């Protein structure tokens, strides 16, 4: 399953995404966790956060986590 499909599936099948996080590669920090509740939308190449300015390329996502459980991993 592609990362875009995994994100969309979670949004449409889960009522509560407050404990789900994207783990991304960050050039400065190494890895970062982004709460799913901060995601506004996703297209074929990018994830757009609801702060109005942050855009994350899909290739930077390495994992989707819920608490200690891995839902998707590259």
From Swiss-Prot:
Species the sequence originates in: Sulfurisphaera tokodaii (strain DSM 16993 / JCM 10545 / NBRC 100140 / 7) (Sulfolobus tokodaii)
Protein known as: UPF0248 protein STK_06965
Family of the protein in this entry: Belongs to the UPF0248 family.
UniProt cross-references to Pfam families, sorted A to Z: MJ1316
